[in-house]
């Protein structure tokens, strides 16, 4: 296991974490590579233009599929929420709503990022009692 691994999993808000809606594949690929540290691993033209990016074995994809980016995004499970926050803030990304959520009895330290394309990302990490904030 790579001790530098940060991304553990990604889950879609709507239908498909490999087809999040964007209007410009090239712009999306460049931004997510620079800001989220993703690497382009696949580009498709059929059935719609799409690009698949990856970090730490976790894949997130973007497609020109007519979807509404403002109603979509992904929940990204990370191994170190504080490191994820520092990394993104260090690149000038505004972090929103740093808080503790509870889901099915599990506390999660979370924050949100709204990307320039309108997609929303919910970064989260399970925490134990006494580890809040």
Please provide the spans of the model-predicted regions.
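Short, well-ordered beta-strand elements within core beta-sheets of diverse protein domains
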Residues: 20, 74-76
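Helix N-cap motif at beta-to-alpha junctions
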Residues: 24-25, 78-82
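A short local loop/turn or secondary-structure capping micro-motif enriched for an aromatic residue
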Residues: 68-72, 129-132
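Vicinal oxygen chelate
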Residues: 1-11, 17-20, 41, 52, ...
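Core segments of cupin and vicinal oxygen chelate
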Residues: 9-13, 19-59
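Eukaryotic phosphotyrosine signaling hubs
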Residues: 15-16, 71-73
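Short amphipathic alpha-helices within nucleic acid-binding modules
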Residues: 31, 82-87
């Amino acid at each position: 296991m790579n001790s530098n691994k940060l991304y553990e999993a990604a889950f879609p808000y709507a239908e498909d974490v490999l087809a999040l809606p964007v209007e410009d594949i090239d712009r999306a690929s460049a931004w997510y590579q620079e800001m989220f540290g993703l690497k382009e691993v696949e580009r498709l033209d059929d059935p719609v233009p799409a690009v698949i990016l990856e970090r730490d074995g976790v894949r997130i994809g973007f497609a020109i599929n007519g979807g509404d980016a403002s109603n979509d995004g992904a929940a990204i499970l990370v191994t170190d929420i504080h490191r994820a926050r520092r990394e993104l803030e260090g690149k000038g990304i505004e972090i929103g709503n740093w808080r503790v959520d509870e889901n099915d009895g599990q506390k999660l330290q979370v924050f949100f990022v709204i990307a320039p394309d309108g997609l929303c990302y919910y970064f989260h990490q399970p925490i134990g009692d006494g580890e809040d904030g």
